[in-house]
Swiss-Prot record:
EC code: 3.4.16.-
Family according to the record: Belongs to the peptidase S10 family.
Keyword Transferase: no
Name of the featured protein: Serine carboxypeptidase-like 12
PANTHER family hit by this protein: SERINE CARBOXYPEPTIDASE-LIKE 11-RELATED (PTHR11802:SF361), SERINE PROTEASE FAMILY S10 SERINE CARBOXYPEPTIDASE (PTHR11802)
Pfam family, one: Peptidase_S10
Disulfide bonds: C80-C323, C244-C258, C282-C289
Catalytic residue positions: S176, D360, H413
Originating organism: Arabidopsis thaliana (Mouse-ear cress)
Top-level class of the enzyme under EC nomenclature: hydrolase
Signal peptide bounds: 1-21
SUPFAM superfamilies: alpha/beta-Hydrolases
Protein's GO biological process: proteolysis
Gene of this entry: SCPL12
Amino acid sequence: MKSTPKLLLLLLFIINHHVDSGSIVKFLPGFEGPLPFELETGYIGIGEEEDVQLFYYFIKSERNPKEDPLLLWLSGGPGCSSITGLLFENGPLALKSKVYNGSVPSLVSTTYSWTKTANIIFLDQPIGAGFSYSRIPLIDTPSDTGEVKNIHEFLQKWLSKHPQFSSNPFYASGDSYSGMIVPALVQEISKGNYICCKPPINLQGYILGNPITYFEVDQNYRIPFSHGMALISDELYESIRRDCKGNYFNVDPRNTKCLKLVEEYHKCTDELNEFNILSPDCDTTSPDCFLYPYYLLGYWINDESVRDALHVNKSSIGKWERCTYQNRIPYNKDINNSIPYHMNNSISGYRSLIYSGDHDLVVPFLATQAWIKSLNYSIIHEWRPWMIKDQIAGYTRTYSNKMTFATVKGSGHTAEYKPNETFIMFQRWISGHDL
């Protein structure tokens, strides 16, 4: 009987250690049978008191997890849950597009998961995004620079709890608004690796899809993109160029000619699906809509059985929302231009893959090409098509700063529009091969 307290203490230690390190998920409601891959979910506490709890989904590589690269995936927004990447862009599961009937929506396996060749951490950030939360009221408004430091701390703590992945090549990745966070994060990790007494992160590079980089410039390139895609007439294009002088969306109220022309531009484009101009602009609650699975996602992830299976802290969050910061949570966008971070990361010698769906109106490929050109690195491999079998899947170019730019033909703002092509592009690049 005297040994009982010691046994209880040991048991508590084991339980606490298990919770801190994450919990293995073997089954998910909506998916038949055990998961055909290893999924871990959990929280990592940030700050001295660890009041900020960042939620993650970790999926081991299906090939060789001990040696394959470790990726961190951040969804955009800011404030969109990373499970949108997992279930819609590059994960091993997807929601089956079937009319909602009141039961838990179904999940199916995918053929295009990046986890076939990489370990991936899908991270919900900032605080309030997905299942990440704070135990106490926030004192400071979440911000770009604040999130960079939080994510860096997350990675350090996650790797200390998963030391078997410390030597794996590490890549930061994401799309859309992550274009403001990932380059700064790479620089932060790079600097942190030189600080004494902390195990270095084996940083090798980064990957960004349709990244927001310099919002005003990104936005202005919508005009030449729209002209090139035959969305506006030659006459309107020439007039708007002449009278707006390259500034189309932050117009001086006194420039009435420009304002009128911009109004004409909106008449031509406002009814488009700006995320992919080839796709219908329709209500996601319609089963005929390409994005109907987003509607199903809300029902799936808010089901109590799903949240239990994912080991979500019951007291942490109410109704899950796909993107929170766009509507109701304050956020300080204090990085307005991420080009200097790209420059610093290039100087430091990190590899990068920057890809653009070529039918995205939100961040047109022309804007991405422009800031890459502004880095002023020489071209190593000239513009050429990259192929899948005997078909052109997009176009690519490589630069002397180890940066590869690629378009994905027919794709939009995120990889979900062409997941198979994006997967093949990623698989070739991460393996060090030409696209």
